[in-house]
């Protein structure tokens, strides 16, 4: 024992009374971890609906991306369980396609929970039985730790065989009021079978003398070990032959039987041989692919989920555990088809996990797939990444995840899902489409439930890096990712209907890549990284200023730039405005005025929230401005494409060299991807 008695039950009670230690179940701890800091909860709009973003899940270098609905469902479930609701008798099961982040989310949650419990004020404590040589029936075993990491407060509530005596002890030695004691007893659990058995032995040896009984205990922190599976532990489904209930519950220990005088002592069961006991003291048990387990293990889970008990040969050990599981769609559907297994599903809070459908957020996930380490070729030379690679890969995989809908095209759906402008289509239209799709009884037909997952993206990137073109050119060229994704479709997507849809989606992604390259080429031609952005904003400011009252005969309009706050002058060029609108297919005055009104409306809504908003998400407008500037304003061999394709004269060669130089020094290209991008631009491939 420490000199200050820090390992005694009395000291622990004193710390709980002073608020330095806590007595709470796993759901209360998890709810406090997520909800304690209100500044870490933000209201956001996702797919046209208001929801909450819990910032604790966005902490760390490699944190959870998106999953707003899934996280909200989980937090709601935990909060309900913490408040004594029905969720405390359920498991939270994430069901979805492979590679959509289910396991990553649970692993992140477990990591956050371990970090949370590592703080002194949040530590979990348990107790050891000691001086067992006095009892005499435990052989050479002198110290035994609570097998299920029971809380010292549970020990205090079971200190005497009489509940009233235990309450009197808490009042006298802990200094707790009657209300506080009643609050503790709302979370009352009996001691586990072996702890209760040992406790009775100690009571008999000590003649029920409380002071003597207390000398046989010491309070210790629960070890926070990821590798040992304490506090957070994972059980992955195994094949039918090697798996057994022992993996979850534990089994009889021959070594212990050699020491124990009484063969009926429940301590003969080594519970820590199983995964559940190691997380029984306020921990999280993660069952990966729960419905892949054979039937007897599923029945074990049914008992554990419902009763929160480990049960062997009639002996019971109450546990304080949050059970989270995952399953892929096919295994879950197969399991549902077996009607006799319905009770376990009835005890689960099923959460269907969709793929990420926000291409802006997908760019973070694509970075995860590419990796943070510096890439090298097979000959150990530095491997450059095309600045358009992330965008190309992200839009391609996101488009495969978007279902077909009559009200929206796939591009409109993608833009709206990312919170961007999609012509005249509003976010409400997307919300309506999602609502209709989410009423489908077939889960895979719901919004975002089917498509290329993160693992498929990883495979495509691996295929890209292993090609001779990538290694010889020392660059991961963006256009090549489409070929790699098509290879993944042929090799890994077995259903013909899905494969045909995904090929169409990748074709659409190629078209978007083409438009991106048009913009990049214009920026390179103008020797300015944001040239097209400036021209787009010129058009927007011109159509706002064209009806201004203070517009003089010289067509000069002065306005305050919302980004810098400075006063700027702009000459209204009606020819330029008309050219852009012709490219947009606006032929009548009514059509033009309607489009201008929509742009002004967007400007008013967006600029007030984000002064840096630049309309670059409006694909049609950006494309029209790019076309006007590239195909109308540029002299030379008829167009920029002609000039770059025909470099037989000095002027065209100088233009080519200047653009290559700009791409190398200002736009983040290497010589390989700069040359390949210009070559692709000149071929007119993937033009809509």
Residue ranges and their predicted role:
Residues 1, 7-688:
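Conserved ASCE/P-loop NTPase catalytic core
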């Amino acid at each position: 024992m420490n000199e200050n008695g820090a390992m005694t039950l009395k000291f622990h009670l004193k710390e709980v009374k002073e608020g330095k230690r806590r007595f709470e179940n796993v759901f209360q701890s998890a709810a406090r971890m997520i909800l304690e800091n209100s500044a870490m909860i933000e209201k956001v709009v996702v797919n046209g609906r208001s929801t909450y973003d819990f910032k604790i899940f966005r902490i760390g270098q490699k944190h959870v991306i998106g999953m707003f609905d899934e996280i909200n469902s989980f937090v709601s479930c935990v909060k309900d369980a913490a408040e004594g609701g029905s969720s405390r008798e359920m498991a939270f099961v994430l069901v979805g396609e492979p590679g959509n982040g289910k396991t990553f989310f649970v692993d992140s949650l477990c990591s956050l929970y371990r970090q949370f419990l590592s703080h002194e004020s949040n530590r979990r404590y348990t107790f050891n039985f000691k001086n067992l040589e006095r009892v005499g029936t435990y052989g050479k075993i002198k110290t035994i730790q609570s097998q299920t990491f029971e809380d010292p407060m549970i020990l205090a509530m079971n200190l005497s065989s009489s509940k009233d005596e235990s309450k009197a002890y808490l009042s006298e030695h802990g200094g707790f009021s009657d209300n506080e004691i009643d609050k503790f007893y709302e979370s009352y659990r009996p001691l586990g079978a072996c702890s209760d058995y040992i406790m009775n032995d100690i009571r008999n040896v000590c003649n029920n003398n409380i002071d003597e009984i207390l000398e046989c205990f010491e309070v210790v922190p629960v070890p926070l070990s990821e590798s040992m599976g304490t506090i957070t532990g994972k059980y992955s489904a195994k094949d039918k032959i090697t798996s057994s209930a022992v993996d979850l519950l534990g089994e009889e220990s021959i070594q212990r039987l050699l020491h124990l005088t009484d063969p009926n002592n429940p301590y003969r069961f080594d519970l820590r041989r199983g995964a559940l006991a190691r997380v029984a003291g306020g921990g999280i048990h993660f069952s990966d692919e729960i419905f892949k387990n054979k039937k007897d293990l599923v029945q074990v889970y049914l008992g554990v989920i419902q009763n929160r008990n480990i049960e062997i040969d009639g002996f019971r050990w109450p546990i304080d555990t949050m059970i989270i599981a995952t399953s892929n769609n096919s295994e879950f559907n197969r399991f549902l088809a077996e009607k006799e297994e319905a009770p376990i599903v009835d005890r689960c809070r099923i959460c269907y996990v969709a793929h990420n459908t926000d291409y802006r957020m997908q760019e973070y996930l694509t970075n995860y797939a590419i990796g943070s380490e510096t890439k090298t070729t097979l000959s150990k030379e530095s491997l450059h990444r095309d600045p358009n690679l992330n965008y190309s890969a992200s839009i391609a995989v996101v488009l495969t995840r978007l279902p077909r809908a009559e009200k929206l095209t796939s591009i409109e759906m993608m833009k709206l899902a990312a919170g961007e402008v999609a012509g005249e289509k509003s976010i409400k239209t997307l919300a309506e489409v999602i609502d209709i799709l989410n009423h489908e009884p077939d889960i895979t037909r719901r919004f975002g439930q089917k498509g290329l997952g993160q693992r498929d993206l990883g495979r495509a990137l691996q295929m890209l890096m292993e090609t001779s073109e990538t290694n010889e050119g020392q660059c991961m060229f963006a256009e090549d990712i489409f070929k790699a994704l098509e290879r993944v479709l042929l090799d890994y997507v077995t259903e013909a209907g899905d494969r045909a849809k995904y090929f169409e989606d990748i074709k659409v992604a190629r078209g978007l890549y083409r438009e991106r390259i048009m913009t990049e080429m214009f920026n390179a031609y103008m020797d300015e990284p944001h040239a097209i952005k400036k021209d787009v904003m010129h058009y927007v400011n011109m159509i706002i200023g064209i009806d201004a009252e203070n517009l003089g005969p010289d067509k000069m309009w002065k306005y305050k730039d919302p980004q810098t706050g400075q006063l700027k002058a702009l000459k209204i060029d009606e020819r330029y405005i008309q050219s852009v609108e012709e490219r947009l297919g606006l032929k009548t005055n009514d059509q033009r005025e309607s489009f201008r009104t929509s742009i002004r409306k967007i400007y008013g809504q967006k600029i007030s929230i984000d002064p840096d908003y630049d309309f670059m998400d409006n694909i049609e407008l950006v494309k029209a401005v790019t076309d006007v500037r590239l195909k109308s304003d540029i002299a030379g061999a008829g167009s920029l494409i002609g000039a770059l394709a025909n470099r037989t004269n000095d002027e065209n060669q100088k233009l080519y060299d200047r653009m290559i130089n700009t791409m190398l020094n200002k736009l983040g290209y290497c010589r390989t991807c700069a040359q390949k991008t210009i070559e692709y631009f000149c071929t007119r491939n993937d033009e809509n």
